[in-house]
Curated annotation (Swiss-Prot):
Its main location: secreted. It comes from Acinonyx jubatus. GO terms for cellular component: spherical high-density lipoprotein particle. PANTHER family: APOLIPOPROTEIN A-II (PTHR11027:SF0). The lineage of its organism: Eukaryota, Metazoa, Chordata, Craniata, Vertebrata. It holds the Pfam family ApoA-II. This is Apolipoprotein A-II.
Length: 100
């Protein structure tokens, strides 16, 4: 009976040790994966900064903003004019009943 209890105890301890070793191995692989992920993100960020420093990208951005401004300026002016006309019509409607 004691021999059976010792065998069960030994098997339990060995299986727990094995699980602990596997868990530690999984943690190491997870740490390695996270480390590789951060390294990749860092490398990508450095490449992006180097590309952004180039005059080509800055020229493209400047051209994009100028084109956008050229297209939006007339729309904004028209919207402002329409808003003023709408408010004037609204004010005229309010003043007409008072004069009658």
């Amino acid at each position: 009976m004691k021999l059976l209890a010792m065998a069960v105890l030994l098997l339990t301890i060995c299986s727990l040790e094995g699980a602990l070793v596997r868990r530690q191995a999984e943690e190491l692989s997870l740490q390695r994966l996270v480390s590789q992920y951060f390294q990749t993100v860092t490398d990508y960020g450095k490449d992006l900064v180097e590309k952004a420093k180039g005059p080509e990208l800055q020229a493209q951005a400047k051209a994009y903003f100028e084109k956008t401004q050229e297209q939006l300026t007339p729309l904004v002016k028209k919207a402002g004019t329409d808003l003023i006309n709408f408010l004037n019509n609204f004010m005229d409607l309010k003043t007409q009943p008072a004069t009658q």
